[in-house]
Amino acid sequence: KSCCPTTAARNQYNICRLPGTPRPVCAALSGCKIISGTGCPPGYRH
């Protein structure tokens, strides 16, 4: 699961993922986090 700090970051992450870019790469580029659970940490609700 990915968690992003803003809607803009979420959009950037999603666009990054479209061609099949690995999740960790897109998370690093967009400022999002990849978590193993179901709940995002505070400040990463998008």
From Swiss-Prot:
GO MF assignments: toxin activity
GO biological process, one term: defense response
Listed Pfam families: Thionin (PF00321)
InterPro entries (alphabetical): Thionin, Thionin-like_sf
Chief location of this protein within or outside the cell: secreted
Keywords: Disulfide bond, Plant defense, Secreted, Toxin
Disulfide bonds: 3-40, 4-32, 16-26
Cellular component per GO, a single term: extracellular region
Cellular compartment(s): Secreted
Family label: Belongs to the plant thionin (TC 1.C.44) family.
The protein's role, per its UniProt record: Thionins are small plant proteins which are toxic to animal cells. They seem to exert their toxic effect at the level of the cell membrane. Their precise function is not known.
Protein name: Denclatoxin-B
Organism (species): Dendrophthora clavata
Taxonomy of the source species: Eukaryota, Viridiplantae, Streptophyta, Embryophyta, Tracheophyta
